[in-house]
Amino acid sequence: MVLAQLGGSISRALAQMSNATVIDEKVLGECLNEISRALLQSDVQFKMVRDMQTNIRKIVNLETLAAGTNKRRIIQQAVFTELCNMLDPGKPAFTPKKGKPSVVMFVGLQGSGKTTTCTKYAYYHQRKGFKPSLVCADTFRAGAFDQLKQNATKAKIPFYGSYMESDPVKIAVEGLERFRKENSDLIIIDTSGRHKQEAALFEEMRQVAEATKPDLVIFVMDGSIGQAAFDQAQAFKQSASVGAVIITKLDGHAKGGGALSAVAATKSPVIFIGTGEHIDEFEIFDVKPFVSRLLGMGDLSGLMDKIQDVMPADQQPELLAKLAEGTFTLRLLYEQFQNLLKMGPIGQVFSMLPGFSSELMPKGHEKEGQAKIKRYMTIMDSMTAAELDSTNPKLMTESRIIRIARGSGRQIRDVTDMLEEYKRLAKMWSKMKGLKMPKNGKMSDLSQNLNIQQMTKALPPQVLKQMGGMGGLQALMKQMGGKDMSKMLGGMGLGGD
């Protein structure tokens, strides 16, 4: 059971509970048993699952709830809160600051994906405006420097290593000195891994750490080991002063939930998760938005950040103005498709859209979804400027549709499908009319200005129902931090699959 399946199973359990005519002990018990079964299949420790059930039952005491209380909403909120508690170590990790030199050392067992993760970490920060660099102090594994060199070259990140020197401490110090002179503000040191935890590995890590004095030591762990992650994370934390954890290989293994919860139990913060082999299949891990996306409710503040990353700053005010007007043209859709294809794995992006993850992209078929978007763009390439800029749906007559289909080499059905998708998105866009725009014109600040009425209009009816209507949304806002809308949006996941 991969994480998407885990989220689907929990969402279905909540949906079945919401659809019940009467919420009684039997319905609550069935819902909690389904959720517990899904968590156990994801290799979450039995004790953690049992404690979660106990805590939810303490919150949701059906006998003592006042008449007229929305039981569905209370159960959903309790499940959301307990899932967050299960994955939250309650301790923040060191965060590099742009322009201020930081040294980060990576440690982990061989085969965990440590070297690849070093490059992903560097690439992520490079896109955020940092000047990262990579140092290969792994002299144990044959080919380690070649791998780092290849990855770094592809990502256009400066690197340092040696084919001749066998002392990892000397290489680490030389690399550190070189990149400090070059004003790198994030120096990442990759260290040797072993097939198992052993004294020699920990001693080497200690020596490299002593010589380089890293601001943060990151432990890279294979997520497929499930709850065994607890012992591994604990051992590294005690021996290597680990300040944060990155969990890899969460894209196709059954035990990801177990690994995440086990690491949280050691009070070690998970800061990123690896969801594939490609350099952009790497996500920042923030508990509330993660649980929100897991349950199909999206992460709008995260989506705004992604849009800001790929959209030039001078285009953002123009897009926000169009959003405030509620005007959505085919040209605007085309531009957003272009941005969407730059944002990284399409499944990751769609999981941030509340209730819309399956509309454009069939579940688990990212390539099909990407191909569909490119097909739609090809169709729009055969449209006139008047057609692209029009907001009048009656403009698309049968003769125009036939002409567009011929010009793009597509079937008439493909053109009508694209137009239906456009109408659906335009309808959703129009509901945001009148939105107060951020004064600085930044997309990332937009989520703070969304009010309850606009959110209620924009959310699909079935998703809003899962949340308990407007009242549920308001209660959740309060739970997620009150006035800060971005925090609330980052973690409002309580519904549909």
UniProtKB/Swiss-Prot annotation:
GO terms for cellular component: cytosol; endoplasmic reticulum; signal recognition particle, endoplasmic reticulum targeting. Residues 1-295 are annotated as: G-domain. It comes from Hordeum vulgare. Belongs to the GTP-binding SRP family. SRP54 subfamily. Its main location: cytoplasm. It catalyses: GTP + H2O = GDP + phosphate + H(+). GTP binds at residues 108-115, 190-194, 248-251. Component of the signal recognition particle (SRP) complex, a ribonucleoprotein complex that mediates the cotranslational targeting of secretory and membrane proteins to the endoplasmic reticulum (ER). As part of the SRP complex, associates with the SRP receptor (SR) component SRPRA to target secretory proteins to the endoplasmic reticulum membrane. Binds to the signal sequence of presecretory proteins when they emerge from the ribosomes. Displays basal GTPase activity, and stimulates reciprocal GTPase activation of the SR subunit SRPRA. Component of a signal recognition particle (SRP) complex that consists of a 7SL RNA molecule of 300 nucleotides and six protein subunits: SRP72, SRP68, SRP54, SRP19, SRP14 and SRP9. Its EC number is 3.6.5.4. This is Signal recognition particle subunit SRP54 2. HAMAP family: SRP54. Residues 296-497 are annotated as: M-domain. Gene3D superfamilies: P-loop containing nucleotide triphosphate hydrolases, Signal recognition particle SRP54, nucleotide-binding domain, Signal recognition particle, SRP54 subunit, M-domain. The NG domain, also named G domain, is a special guanosine triphosphatase (GTPase) domain, which binds GTP and forms a guanosine 5'-triphosphate (GTP)-dependent complex with a homologous NG domain in the SRP receptor subunit SRPRA. The two NG domains undergo cooperative rearrangements upon their assembly, which culminate in the reciprocal activation of the GTPase activity of one another. SRP receptor compaction upon binding with cargo-loaded SRP and GTPase rearrangement drive SRP-mediated cotranslational protein translocation into the ER. PROSITE patterns: SRP54.
